């Protein structure tokens, strides 16, 4: 029997006849980072809310560490929302102490825990700084610290890197990995940053129209759409995009051609070798290529292949 920390069994959520989540069954293993991907309105947020007890399903149930979710202990789950939930008039240390008191963390455990979080998330020098004076990156790291001050077994991160600079993002990623690798926590991650999902997730669920359409490792998901590289180009006249797609689709060894956010993605075998013929088709249409790159398959390519839409659409 698989050792699941969270198991969703046939979860369905309906709103006045609209099915937001449709018969979803997912098992999240202990000690893994589990990523959720889906376009806006796909049902991923509703799914997660049901899986952590914030929303009652229309039907189905959720088992957390062998117990019905209605019977789990207070503090089993830590939530780090995308919106910053901070006390602007308190210092970092005061904020962490207050949250620890809310969870009734004993003082002999609280004090070293607060200091460790300040150290691990590079906030020690700002421990006595009022939150309103922190940078955006520091506030987001404090937001995470508040979510885990009580040592939850499960941590839910909703767009944790939103708006962060690369340095702050790297600090956050390293801490997320440490929660899994050192502390053995189960982490549920939602993100629009494809590199983040790829780098951090052990497995990823792709949700669309309230249904689970794929669940696998990032590597296996990228293998699933097959061989070939992707030529990503932007034309001087976006109105010609569909004309170029029609020109290229019959070509040999071109696997797929799609328009994504005003650009054309061409997945092909020996993509670099195909560039001269592609350029001939562009010239035939009387337009020029403003920007072009050749890359390997990404998770976003997987998503587009499976759903026919971009992640932010």
Predicted regions and their residues:
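Catalytic Walker B motif of ABC-type/P-loop ATPase nucleotide-binding domains
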Residues: 155-158
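Conserved ABC ATPase signature
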Residues: 130-134
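Conserved ABC transporter NBD signature motif
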Residues: 60-75
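Conserved ABC ATPase "signature" region
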Residues: 97, 101, 108-126
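Helix-to-loop junction immediately C-terminal to a conserved catalytic motif
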Residues: 52
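ABC transporter nucleotide-binding domain
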Residues: 174-269
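Conserved catalytic motifs of ABC-family nucleotide-binding domains
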Residues: 151
